Amino acid sequence: MTFRDLLSVSFEGPRPDSSAGGSSAGGGGGSAGGAAPSEGPAVGGVPGGAGGGGGVVGAGSGEDNRSSAGEPGSAGAGGDVNGTAAVGGLVVSAQGVGVGVFLAAFILMAVAGNLLVILSVACNRHLQTVTNYFIVNLAVADLLLSATVLPFSATMEVLGFWAFGRAFCDVWAAVDVLCCTASILSLCTISVDRYVGVRHSLKYPAIMTERKAAAILALLWVVALVVSVGPLLGWKEPVPPDERFCGITEEAGYAVFSSVCSFYLPMAVIVVMYCRVYVVARSTTRSLEAGVKRERGKASEVVLRIHCRGAATGADGAHGMRSAKGHTFRSSLSVRLLKFSREKKAAKTLAIVVGVFVLCWFPFFFVLPLGSLFPQLKPSEGVFKVIFWLGYFNSCVNPLIYPCSSREFKRAFLRLLRCQCRRRRRRRPLWRVYGHHWRASTSGLRQDCAPSSGDAPPGAPLALTALPDPDPEPPGTPEMQAPVASRRKPPSAFREWRLLGPFRRPTTQLRAKVSSLSHKIRAGGAQRAEAACAQRSEVEAVSLGVPHEVAEGATCQAYELADYSNLRETDI
């Protein structure tokens, strides 16, 4: 049974009697050719020949003239190929048409899906991250496999033999190994990248730079090239005499070498990395939810963190406020939690990709070295064909996993299908990453709790910007001129960092994070305290993930905000 038989339509057309072909096959060999069995045995994947002077294959029976390796035998001058046409004819049976239609749809789906992944990252700046560069490399390898290898493999399945010559067969087999190895190594690289992203979420941009990513990808393709050139340099089985036979080499040494380098070592790294990702994700999630996460050592990054402290306020002479006994509510909202949740979600998405990869490729890389070392354990031809194409199926299914698991890729795919390459630019300036408008809610407050004249008026925007402060504090407000650490903070004060230097145009990711935080703050500030000024929340500090030398040059200013006392650590 062949792969074509598994996918063929139920059709049996009349076959021409080819006994004449057997009788004309070389001097004195007609009777032997006509009496030969329908399928000669194959030794080492090379089609066997029937006995007789000129009857290389028995075409007289009218059956398919194929070896156990799925390749046609060498017919005589008047013999038939696959029992449908004379030598040189490419007439395909109905079952071949069915297989061809299925494989053509398969190849087109693989090409289109991987093109969508590449164009999605190319046309959307917010997807142009180091992790997605590795995903693009995976899509490039799968695209090369789908466009340069699979069409010839499908043609060989439909025709039943290799029709492109011996030299091109060697090149085709090498490119096949190259693309498959590059695809598998890309998944290995992605798993390491995800571990670094989850384990060191804030340090990740400094650890995994674009230059390092480019070096890793270059090394990846070099390793894939080294694995694939072995057969071209002679590390393969003896060349079969029939040029219409073409397949991957099953030489025992090379089969073991390629299986270890292309699959087993990368799979071991992938499994270890994702086990570590799971352990780190579980421990970090618990510590963040419990509010006990502490920075170890001297941090080189800043954490976007808001501390909300409940305080009872009232008339207090010159300062107009005083502290009182009561419950102190303190919550820490950190971008680390938000970024970590994004990294964990990305790790889940890529874990699905890796799981599908193992299911697709493990059967092939288990059967290949096993059959090379122990020929008696080789599976049947039909089973091997299914296993062989199951590995190719991985290149088709990878692009289907992204839109199902990643909302960003799903939106990018939809925009591409609607011929919208880029998002429309927002009208507001690109440097404005956080906006929160004052609530006109001071009418019900006592005068001693209302914002002072030195604070920003209602309706004034609160924006985290990358530009210097356009409105310097008036000289008559010594509290605003005092250092941040020494002056008393007004109730419900929000300190705004204004970044300088290289952060003049913050990234889209930072805008998205702070925008999400804005929604949480607005939701938390919707509920007012029952007694006016009885319980106020103070947004004590805001800091961002930037190096210390950049943060030292940032300016700070205080504003009155609404009550945010019901914010929790897990809100973001």
Curated annotation (Swiss-Prot):
The family database entries (InterPro entries) matched by this protein are listed as:
ADR_fam, ADRA1D_rcpt, GPCR_Rhodpsn, GPCR_Rhodpsn_7TM
Q: What Pfam families does this protein map onto?
A: 7tm_1
Major site of localization recorded for this protein = membrane
Q: Where is the composition biased (Gly residues)?
A: 23-33, 42-61
User: Which stretches does UniProt call biased (Low complexity)?
Assistant: 450-468
**Which cellular compartments is it found in?**
Cell membrane
Q: Which GO terms describe its biological process?
A: adenylate cyclase-activating adrenergic receptor signaling pathway; adenylate cyclase-modulating G protein-coupled receptor signaling pathway; cell-cell signaling; G protein-coupled receptor signaling pathway; neuron-glial cell signaling; phospholipase C-activating G protein-coupled receptor signaling pathway; positive regulation of cell population proliferation; positive regulation of cytosolic calcium ion concentration
In the record, what terms sit under GO molecular function? alpha1-adrenergic receptor activity; identical protein binding
On whether Cytoplasm is a keyword of this UniProt record, the answer is no
The entry sums up its family as follows: Belongs to the G-protein coupled receptor 1 family. Adrenergic receptor subfamily. ADRA1D sub-subfamily.
For this entry, the protein name equals Alpha-1D adrenergic receptor
State the organism of origin: Homo sapiens (Human)
Q: What is the lineage of its organism?
A: Eukaryota, Metazoa, Chordata, Craniata, Vertebrata
